[in-house]
Amino acid sequence: MAANKSYKSYFLDPLWGNNQPLIAILGICSALAVTTTVNTAITMGLAVSFVTGCSSFFVSLLRKATPDSVRMITQLIIISLFVIVIDQFLKAFFFTISKTLSVFVGLIITNCIVMGRAESLARNVPPIPAFLDGLASGLGYGWVLVTVSIVREFFGFGTILGLQLIPKCFYASETHPDGYENFGLMVLAPSAFFLLGIMIWGVNILRSKKAKR
């Protein structure tokens, strides 16, 4: 497999052509909780990129020394190690965001993308391609989260990255009862699934049109 693909392909393919949330429909559950604001979406995307890239690298590095009978346990231990590292890093240097994300950083270990890349690719290719694939899979997951979070934060709160984009004077008040009001549905968890569904639908249309050419 490694001989047939360049490093560039290993990195670029998961960003779009084999994007895990949009193509494989993996890792979408966390979109419910972490896409309310762009800050949390970026943080979760980077955290998953770190865990997936590093765990894929070490799964690949140890692939020849790991018996098939214990490979899943070994992969889980490796993934858990890097989840703990990123969790402690966020608590030490980005406590506010860590508190906002709460248990969802720890739940990265249950993210299907992380185990999926380790099992389907990392144990079959050398460490560098495995790392590039894992890193890009996390980044591909990240940009999907950020896209969803931009829509949710803008319409739900009128902000992006905490910056007020919709002027306060536009909002409804006692003197202007007919003014703008935030779209409350976007703050609710189901809105993330609606937006992801629209994105998946759009990607499938683009892929089908490309296939017909």
UniProtKB/Swiss-Prot annotation:
<feature type="transmembrane region" description="Helical">
    <location>
        <begin position="101"/>
        <end position="121"/>
    </location>
</feature>
<feature type="transmembrane region" description="Helical">
    <location>
        <begin position="21"/>
        <end position="41"/>
    </location>
</feature>
<keyword id="KW-0830">Ubiquinone</keyword>
<dbReference type="GO" id="GO:0016655">
    <property type="term" value="F:oxidoreductase activity, acting on NAD(P)H, quinone or similar compound as acceptor"/>
</dbReference>
<comment type="function">
    <text>NQR complex catalyzes the reduction of ubiquinone-1 to ubiquinol by two successive reactions, coupled with the transport of Na(+) ions from the cytoplasm to the periplasm. NqrA to NqrE are probably involved in the second step, the conversion of ubisemiquinone to ubiquinol.</text>
</comment>
<dbReference type="InterPro" id="IPR011292">
    <property type="entry name" value="NqrD"/>
</dbReference>
<keyword id="KW-1278">Translocase</keyword>
<feature type="transmembrane region" description="Helical">
    <location>
        <begin position="69"/>
        <end position="86"/>
    </location>
</feature>
<dbReference type="Pfam" id="PF02508">
    <property type="entry name" value="Rnf-Nqr"/>
</dbReference>
<keyword id="KW-1003">Cell membrane</keyword>
<feature type="transmembrane region" description="Helical">
    <location>
        <begin position="183"/>
        <end position="203"/>
    </location>
</feature>
<keyword id="KW-0813">Transport</keyword>
<dbReference type="InterPro" id="IPR003667">
    <property type="entry name" value="NqrDE/RnfAE"/>
</dbReference>
<keyword id="KW-0406">Ion transport</keyword>
<keyword id="KW-0812">Transmembrane</keyword>
<dbReference type="GO" id="GO:0005886">
    <property type="term" value="C:plasma membrane"/>
</dbReference>
<keyword id="KW-1133">Transmembrane helix</keyword>
<feature type="transmembrane region" description="Helical">
    <location>
        <begin position="131"/>
        <end position="151"/>
    </location>
</feature>
<protein>
    <recommendedName>
        <fullName>Na(+)-translocating NADH-quinone reductase subunit D</fullName>
        <ecNumber>7.2.1.1</ecNumber>
    </recommendedName>
</protein>
<comment type="subunit">
    <text>Composed of six subunits; NqrA, NqrB, NqrC, NqrD, NqrE and NqrF.</text>
</comment>
<feature type="transmembrane region" description="Helical">
    <location>
        <begin position="42"/>
        <end position="62"/>
    </location>
</feature>
<dbReference type="GO" id="GO:0006814">
    <property type="term" value="P:sodium ion transport"/>
</dbReference>
<keyword id="KW-0997">Cell inner membrane</keyword>
<keyword id="KW-0472">Membrane</keyword>
<comment type="similarity">
    <text>Belongs to the NqrDE/RnfAE family.</text>
</comment>
<keyword id="KW-0520">NAD</keyword>
<keyword id="KW-0739">Sodium transport</keyword>
<keyword id="KW-0915">Sodium</keyword>
